[in-house]
Structure formats: structure tokens, C-alpha cells
Amino acid sequence: MIKAMNISYEIGDKLYLNITNKCPCNCTFCIRHNGDGAYGSDPLWLEHQPTAEEGIDNIKKRDLDSYKEIIFCGYGEPTCELEILKETAKYIKSVTKTPIRINTNGLSDLINKRETPAEFKGLVDIISISLNASDAKAYDEITRPSFKGVNCFEEMLSFAKRVKEFVPEVMLTVVDIIGEEEIKKSQAVADSVGIHLRVCLLYTSPS
């Protein structure tokens, strides 16, 4: 495992922010199992947990107006450091109109032990939430969350439904390797909560 302090990294015309390595899940398909970086990036394992100040200093070196999107997504779940995320997003909003997206597992309420959807208001343009499966059993098998005695699938869907009130665009995602039948069932779940489903091609493009 190679560690560095690559808090931001580019893929195509998008800037990704790697603000933490913490994550309460151990997804079977997670790219962290396959190497030190994502889609050709430099190592994303961090030498230490960066502060908001470190993250902001890092992105000040970037031309934020030049990107199509700025995405909180790295080798960890960004809502594990929610205060750092919010402070960083607030700075970004103060200097550019480039849209901000968060790629999340949707377990922010469990992670932070409080209701968090309203905290994203005015700071985030898009939230992409990993649905991963069409029911709780399959979800636990794929996502392998560390929270015990909790229906994480329902917690994730509840977060998705509530955060729609505060963020302009919300989407749910699955990866293509779950198969056509499971994707159809996942589409039905997304339709039931009125949220767009995106199918991501694993290992060919970041979600």
C-alpha cells in the first residue's frame, strides 16, 4: 500500500476530492481492493486524515472553473468527515459556479448519529447514492456494512428520499456486474421513491 496526500485528483474534465479513507462499508466490488489509485490516478491512500484547511489549500492550486464537475469521491466515504466536507464545499461555492457532487453510500445519518439531509442545502448540487442492490439481503451481501442490528438498506433509501428536499439533483446507482435481472429490480426500487437510477460500468468509468 502506497500512501500520499493526494487530496484532489483529475479524471477527464472532472475534479475528484479524496477527503478521507474512512468507510463503514466493505463493498465486494470496491476499487480499493484492486490497487492504490483510481482509474490511473496517483495513490489515494492518505498519510493522515487531512483537515479542511489542508483540503482547501490543496484545491486552491486548481483552476476550479475549468472543470465540468467537482466530486467528493475518493478512497473513503466523504460523509465520514461531514464537517470537512461542508467547509470545503462552502469554500468551493464561494469561488466557482462549477457544480458540486457527492458520491456517497447514503449512510450519513448512521455515520454521524443524527439526521443530516438538511446540512447539504446550498452546498451541493448533486448527490449520487449507492443503491447497490434491490433488497436488504442482497445489499448487505454486497455492501457488507459495519453497522449491526440496523437495516442499512432502508436507512439508505430513507436518506435518499429526505435529501431530495435539500439538493437539486439526487440519483441512485448500481454497478453493471449485479446482472440484468437485479438491475431491473433496482430500477423498480428507484421508481418507487421517485429517484433516477444510473447503471455504472465497473472499472471503466468512475461513478
Where are these regions (language model features)?
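Conserved AdoMet/S-adenosylmethionine-binding subsite of the radical SAM
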Residues: 75-202
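Generic structural signal for conserved hydrophobic packing positions in ordered secondary structure
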Residues: 17, 70-72, 139
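Conserved alpha-helical substructure of the radical SAM core
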Residues: 33-71, 83
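A generic local structural motif
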Residues: 2-4, 56-59, 113-117, 158
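Flexible, charged surface loops at secondary-structure boundaries
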Residues: 9-11, 62-65, 121-122
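Canonical Radical SAM [4Fe-4S] cluster-binding loop centered on the CxxxCxxC motif
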Residues: 4-51
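Conserved small/polar residues in nucleotide/adenosyl-binding loops
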Residues: 203-207
